[in-house]
Each structure stands twice: as structure tokens, then as C-alpha cells.
């Protein structure tokens, strides 16, 4: 069965309670449930992992080779700091989509640079948690080549 890996970086486990004026009240569990339901409508699955630890995310990216067809990732603060995460994504050769809940370009200047964006198949910012649905749908249709089952 085709599979998408959905990764979330540091502090995203706090979705729903962390700065709801920025991130909304949708929880990470809600995001993952919707992503899995969407993938199922394409005959695919979504595997989810959230970690506050860079090495855990990197290890899971390495494990995705041969198992997943694409990666959807919200790297959180690692967006702006992690060359290692970039290298892991490039090293496994899987297409990936970068997601950010807020418009990072409208926030503090240190959030404007991403180590991933120039290599991502797509970058989705500022759509709130709906951005995950856009990313999963795009990955399934355009990176994996599936059509939604009617």
C-alpha cells in the first residue's frame, strides 16, 4: 500500500494549547487523524511521528527509504537550524513537502530562512493546520501519482 510519512518537529506535540492565537486549537492528534482519513480515500496510508529530538526525526527519515513514497514535514524550529535534517531528506532521495502552520515570513526575521525549502517539492505556509491536508493531497496526487477513490 502506498505510504506517506508525516513528520512533526519540536513543540508540535503542543498543538491545540500552545499559542492558540498563532497555531489554533486543532491538536496534533486531530491533524494526524484527518491526514490518515484523507490518505485512506486514495488507498494509501500515512505514518506519523512527532519528536522534539532531531536525531529521532533523522533516524525515521532514514527508515522511510523503501517504505514511503513521500514525506510531509513540519520541521518546526529545526527549519531554521538543521543542516542534518536537510541532509537526511536529500540522502534518502524521497520527495518531500515542507509545511508551516503560520506564515513564517510574517514573523521574526530568524524564522525567514529555511534549510529545506529550496529542495522541497512544495512549501505550504500560513494555511493553519489545513496546510497538512493540502500537503498530503498534493503528495498523493503529484508525488505518488494516485487518484482519489470515488
Curated annotation (Swiss-Prot):
It holds the Pfam family DHquinase_II. PROSITE patterns: DEHYDROQUINASE_II. It catalyses: 3-dehydroquinate = 3-dehydroshikimate + H2O. Substrate binds at residues 74, 80, 87, 101-102, 111. The record marks 18 as: Transition state stabilizer. The active site is at residues 23, 100. The keyword Lyase applies. Keywords: Lyase, Quinate metabolism. GO terms for biological process: 3,4-dihydroxybenzoate biosynthetic process; quinate catabolic process. Pathway: Aromatic compound metabolism; 3,4-dihydroxybenzoate biosynthesis; 3,4-dihydroxybenzoate from 3-dehydroquinate: step 1/2. It is an enzyme of class 4 (lyase). Its EC number is 4.2.1.10. Gene3D superfamilies: Dehydroquinase, class II (3.40.50.9100). One of its GO terms (molecular function) is 3-dehydroquinate dehydratase activity. Is involved in the catabolism of quinate. Allows the utilization of quinate as carbon source via the beta-ketoadipate pathway. Homododecamer. Adopts a ring-like structure, composed of an arrangement of two hexameric rings stacked on top of one another. NCBIfam families: aroQ, PRK05395.1-1, PRK05395.1-2, PRK05395.1-3, PRK05395.1-4. Belongs to the type-II 3-dehydroquinase family. This is Catabolic 3-dehydroquinase 2. It comes from Aspergillus flavus (strain ATCC 200026 / FGSC A1120 / IAM 13836 / NRRL 3357 / JCM 12722 / SRRC 167).
Amino acid at each position: 500500500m502506498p505510504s506517506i510519512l508525516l513528520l512533526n518537529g519540536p513543540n508540535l506535540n503542543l498543538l491545540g494549547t500552545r499559542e492558540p492565537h498563532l497555531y489554533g486549537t486543532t491538536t496534533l492528534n486531530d491533524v494526524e487523524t484527518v491526514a490518515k482519513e484523507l490518505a485512506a480515500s486514495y488507498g494509501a496510508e500515512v505514518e506519523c511521528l512527532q519528536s522534539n529530538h532531531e536525531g529521532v526525526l533523522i533516524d525515521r527519515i532514514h527508515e522511510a527509504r523503501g517504505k514511503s513514497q513521500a514525506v510531509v514535514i513540519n520541521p518546526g524550529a529545526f527549519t531554521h537550524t538543521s543542516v542534518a535534517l536537510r541532509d537526511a531528506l536529500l540522502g534518502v532521495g524521497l520527495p518531500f513537502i515542507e509545511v508551516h502552520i503560520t506564515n513564517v515570513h510574517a514573523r521574526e526575521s530568524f524564522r525567514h530562512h529555511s534549510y529545506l525549502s529550496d529542495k522541497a517539492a512544495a512549501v505550504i505556509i500560513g494555511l493553519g493546520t489545513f496546510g497538512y491536508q493540502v500537503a498530503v493531497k498534493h503528495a498523493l496526487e503529484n508525488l505518488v501519482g494516485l487518484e482519489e477513490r470515488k
